[in-house]
């Protein structure tokens, strides 16, 4: 027999979802059904929480307590870089493996690095910024109209200064 349901217990679930779309409730059902939640309602909550990342795959954290689910987005570096590009959302069914050809300012990259600092293994803001620049290169965008790798080399050589706070 399963243990008694504790109303004060907090459970965390991490799911991958496409921003702004109601996920398939059939995929949610086995994960949240045993916790006493409606998959349809949770799917709508996820769609509401991810609407600013429309069309981009993001990780969603579900905090479940007392049969109430609270959805919050845990953005990855690539999703933050893609939203910083401010491209119009694409149709996922037609366009696959898209290279994003845009330009981002270095200040925006540093701002993304500040957001990702606690999740990163880099000790300094410069090292986290280099991680984000590597992500920008794999996404396919440019930074200050240059290849992101050239900016990484500039940071390593000391030509480009990254603030420490």
From Swiss-Prot:
Residues with N5-methylarginine modification: 67
UniProt subunit comment: Component of the large ribosomal subunit (LSU). Mature yeast ribosomes consist of a small (40S) and a large (60S) subunit. The 40S small subunit contains 1 molecule of ribosomal RNA (18S rRNA) and 33 different proteins (encoded by 57 genes). The large 60S subunit contains 3 rRNA molecules (25S, 5.8S and 5S rRNA) and 46 different proteins (encoded by 81 genes).
UniProt modification remark: It appears that the main modified species for L12 contains 6 methyl groups, 2 on Pro-2, 3 on Lys-4 and 1 on Arg-67. Although not reproduced with a second method, methylation at Lys-11 cannot be ruled out.
Cellular localisation: Cytoplasm
Name used for this protein in its record: Large ribosomal subunit protein uL11A
GO MF assignments: large ribosomal subunit rRNA binding; structural constituent of ribosome
Record family assignment: Belongs to the universal ribosomal protein uL11 family.
Note: Present with 68500 molecules/cell in log phase SD medium.
Residue list for modification N6,N6,N6-trimethyllysine: 4, 11
Residues that bear Phosphoserine: 25, 38
A GO cellular component entry from the record: cytosolic large ribosomal subunit
GO terms (BP aspect): cytoplasmic translation; ribosomal large subunit assembly; translation
Alphabetic keyword roster: Cytoplasm, Isopeptide bond, Methylation, Phosphoprotein, Ribonucleoprotein, Ribosomal protein, RNA-binding, Ubl conjugation
Stored HAMAP family: Ribosomal_uL11
Principal cellular location given in the protein's record: cytoplasm
Keyword Transmembrane: no
Lineage of the species this protein comes from: Eukaryota, Fungi, Dikarya, Ascomycota, Saccharomycotina
């Amino acid at each position: 027999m399963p243990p008694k349901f504790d109303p004060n217990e907090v459970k965390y679930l991490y799911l991958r979802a496409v921003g702004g779309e109601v996920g398939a409730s059939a995929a949610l059902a086995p994960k949240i059904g045993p916790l006493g939640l409606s998959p349809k309602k949770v799917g709508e909550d996820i769609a509401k929480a991810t609407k600013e990342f429309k069309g981009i795959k993001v990780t969603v954290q579900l905090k479940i307590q007392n049969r109430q689910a609270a959805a919050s987005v845990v953005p990855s570096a690539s999703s933050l870089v893609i939203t910083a590009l401010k491209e119009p959302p694409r149709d996922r069914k037609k366009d696959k493996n898209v290279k994003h050809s845009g330009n981002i300012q270095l200040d925006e990259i540093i701002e993304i690095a500040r957001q990702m600092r606690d999740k990163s293994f880099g000790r300094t803001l410069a090292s986290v910024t280099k991680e984000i620049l590597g992500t920008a290169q794999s996404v396919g965008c440019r930074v200050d109209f240059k290849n992101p790798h050239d900016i990484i080399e500039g940071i390593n050589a000391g030509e480009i200064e990254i603030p420490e706070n």
